[in-house]
Regions:
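Short, acidic/turn-prone active-site loops that include or flank metal/cofactor-
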Residues: 61-66, 153-157
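Short, active-site-adjacent cap segments at secondary-structure transitions
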Residues: 44-45, 134-136
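Glycine-rich phosphate-binding loop signature in dinucleotide/nucleotide-binding domains
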Residues: 30-31, 116-124
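Domain-level recognition of soluble alpha/beta enzyme cores
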Residues: 146-166
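Active-site-proximal alpha-helix that buttresses catalytic centers in soluble enzyme cores
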Residues: 1-62, 79-110
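Short aromatic-enriched loop/helix-cap "lid" or pocket-rim segments at secondary-structure transitions
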Residues: 1-3, 69-74, 140-141
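Generic beta-sheet signal
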Residues: 34, 122-132
Length: 166
């Protein structure tokens, strides 16, 4: 499992590929937003810069990716893509059992909702650059706080968007 943990750490430390280009509609949304908020992880910072070059972004560790538990039921040495599938299947199984995240992660998502609430009151439209698993948790907390989820674009793919309104 040390290899898997090393891979997770390297992924967190990485930026984004030079050829990774956001869709025009997302670039336009980021450019016109009153506030751009991003996780403090390198790939989120790079994504924010790619979305809105030169725009000052607020940076918050509240929007960091949620670390998904490496399942202990996988005992063999497997290629990293197999581990990625097992990690996500384990997370989905825990979600189905009502355990989407640790209490500390749930609190962090609630704190992130408060951050986004405050930013939207100050600036109107907010674009938040965050990460897949945490975004799922954040989306649930936004809805619980009275926000309305609109049609998602791109699911969990890079450059996807999950709009919400109040």
């Amino acid at each position: 499992m040390d290899g898997v943990h090393g891979w997770q750490g390297a992924y967190d430390a990485a930026g984004i590929l030079a050829e990774s280009v956001p869709p025009r509609a997302l670039v336009d949304a980021a450019a016109s937003a009153g506030c751009l908020i991003t996780s403090d992880m390198p790939r989120a910072l790079a994504s924010a810069e790619r979305l809105a070059p030169g725009k000052v972004a607020r940076v918050s560790p509240l929007l960091r990716e949620m670390h998904l538990e490496v399942p202990r039921w996988v005992r063999a040495r497997w290629p990293l893509p197999v581990w990625a599938v097992c990690i996500h299947l384990h997370w989905l199984a825990r979600e189905r059992c009502g355990e989407i995240a640790a209490p500390s992660e749930l609190q962090r998502a609630a704190d992130a909702v408060a951050l986004l609430d405050d930013a939207s009151r100050e600036a109107g439209t907010v674009v938040a650059v965050t990460h897949g698993a945490f975004r799922r948790l954040l989306a649930l907390q936004l809805v619980a706080a009275g926000w309305r989820a609109e049609r998602r674009v791109g699911g969990y793919q890079n450059w996807s968007s999950w709009p919400f309104s109040r």
